[in-house]
């Protein structure tokens, strides 16, 4: 071989090696290797740094120490704690602030000296069907200052609830470094099939080789144990189901008590009643919600509104007026709703409210996880609902993975001239996972929203915030996820409306993860207020 030819061959050989290395690094960065060896602790770059993200979104005065709770009497006890009014007269006028001091005590009757507990407050009158949430300030020393607003005449009561102690919150974070739930993936080729564990974080799935199915999940991180059968490949993944997993979680008995029914969501005793006089309505001169800069909706302090006679009344703007006005406003438009079963409730409530008819596949189950579409021919309007991508809890039955596409993928497909309204929501299906998973997804959605607004500046976009509930312990993460959404959508606040739904459920102290349909209707009407 001549020296010239040898030199050219070496250069070509070096070029091929560099090309392969670059391609491997690039693909690894974008999607990770198809098979990841957990035994050798090789993760995608996204997973290596994800263990501490999310903590920055915790409230002020909150820390996450390494120690675990072993003494069941050390946390705050609602029944041992107390609350009292700053103004002992208990008489207020419409619009005045009602201030309450809350002092927490532990199971030994000793005053708490640290903060970090999840304390919520509301004002209510069941006879008037009037309810409003309040704003709670953590003083960092075991005491909390709650501020409510006098919004209706008559006598009302104050309810202060210790939803989660700081020790419970620390435990909830710690077990999400493991996993409190798994998606099971089915791999199938011909008559051979196998079920394996799946998770959005590779570090959770230890002990076996993994299939990196991020690309198949629309670019959202997704991993499953590689099937043991040599007849099954990673691309044979077809279906998913869900399994809860409390086995092996690193919880002490004291922590288990805090995360079990009866260990959270307990009202602090106190017969605190106030009376409000003066029927003047100080909120009469507020603008129409449709004329309000959407940036305001991202920075509102509770309460943003209140229920009166079970009708929601926003405070900073005039809300829903009448159905005819809404129908006129929606004429020729399409509403696209993304999310979970709570936005599916929105879709369900809108069908009779707007007199639409379902034109997609009839729902054979109440837990419907396929896209749905309805038409309102009488005023040229259509609406669609799409479930989120994985992680998505489809329940105990098997569902095809092809129906679970990322919101960002749908947003990228919306045309430049479509007359469209978009509602985006993520929440409950992410509670079982470390907050990093939500953070990754919401950033991707925000990027796609930016692209959409550049392409179609006339599109109307809503971000439906989280809600609160008492039916299980995970609702603490509502504030963390809302903070993440706020951060991810920075620079878009004046173009996207944030719907602070937790004020609706805090006001009513909603128990179930699915709010009652009478409240869902009020949420939908509130959204419409910003359209017309």
Which sequence ranges carry the predicted segments?
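A compositional signature for long Ser/Thr(±Pro)-rich, low-complexity
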Residues: 2-139, 145, 149-532
């Amino acid at each position: 071989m001549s020296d010239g030819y040898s030199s050219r061959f070496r250069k070509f050989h070096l070029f091929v090696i560099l090309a392969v290395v670059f391609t491997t690094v690039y693909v690894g960065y974008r999607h990770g290797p198809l098979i990841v060896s957990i035994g050798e602790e090789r993760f995608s770059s996204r997973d290596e740094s994800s263990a501490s993200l999310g903590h920055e979104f915790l409230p002020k005065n909150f820390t996450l120490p390494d120690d675990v709770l072993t003494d069941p009497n050390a946390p705050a006890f609602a029944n041992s704690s107390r609350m009292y009014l700053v103004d002992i007269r208990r008489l207020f006028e419409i619009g005045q602030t009602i201030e309450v001091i809350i002092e927490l005590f532990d199971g030994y009757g000793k005053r708490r000296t640290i903060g970090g507990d999840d304390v919520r407050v509301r004002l209510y009158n069941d006879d008037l069907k009037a309810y409003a949430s309040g704003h709670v300030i953590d003083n960092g020393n075991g005491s909390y200052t709650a501020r409510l607003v006098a919004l209706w005449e008559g006598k009302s009561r104050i309810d202060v609830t210790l939803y989660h102690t700081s020790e419970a919150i620390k435990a909830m974070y710690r077990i999400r470094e493991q996993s409190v739930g798994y998606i099971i993936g089915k791999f199938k080729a011909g008559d051979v099939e196998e079920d394996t564990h799946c998770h959005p974080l590779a570090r959770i799935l230890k002990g076996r080789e993994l299939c990196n199915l991020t690309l198949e999940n629309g670019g959202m991180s997704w991993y499953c144990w590689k099937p043991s059968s040599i007849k099954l490949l990673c691309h044979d993944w077809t279906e998913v189901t869900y399994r809860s997993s409390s086995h092996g979680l690193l919880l002490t008995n004291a922590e288990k008590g805090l995360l079990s029914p009866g260990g959270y969501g307990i009202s602090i005793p106190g017969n605190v009643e106030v009376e409000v006089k003066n029927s003047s309505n100080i909120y009469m001169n507020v603008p129409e919600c449709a004329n309000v800069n959407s940036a305001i909706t991202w920075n509102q302090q509770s309460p943003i509104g209140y229920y009166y006679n079970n009708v929601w009344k926003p405070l900073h703007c005039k809300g829903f007026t009448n159905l005819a006005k809404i129908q006129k406003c929606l004429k020729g438009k399409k509403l696209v709703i993304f999310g979970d079963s709570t936005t599916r409730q929105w879709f369900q409530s809108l069908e009779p409210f707007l007199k639409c008819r379902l034109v997609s596949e009839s729902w054979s189950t109440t837990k419907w996880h396929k896209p749905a579409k309805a038409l309102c021919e009488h005023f040229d309007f259509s609406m669609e609902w799409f479930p989120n991508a994985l992680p998505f809890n489809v329940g105990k039955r098997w569902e095809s993975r092809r129906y679970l596409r990322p919101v960002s993928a749908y947003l990228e497909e919306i045309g430049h001239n479509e007359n469209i309204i978009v509602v985006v929501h993520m929440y409950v299906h992410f509670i079982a996972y470390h907050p990093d998973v939500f953070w990754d997804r919401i950033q991707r959605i925000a990027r796609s929203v930016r692209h959409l607004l550049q392409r179609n500046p006339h599109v109307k976009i809503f971000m439906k915030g989280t809600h609160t509930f008492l039916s299980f312990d995970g609702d603490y993460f509502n504030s963390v996820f809302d903070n993440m959404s706020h951060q991810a959508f920075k620079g878009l606040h004046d173009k996207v409306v944030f719907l602070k739904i937790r004020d609706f459920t805090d006001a009513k102290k909603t128990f179930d993860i699915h709010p009652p349909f009478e409240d869902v209707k009020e949420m939908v009407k509130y959204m419409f207020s910003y359209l017309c």
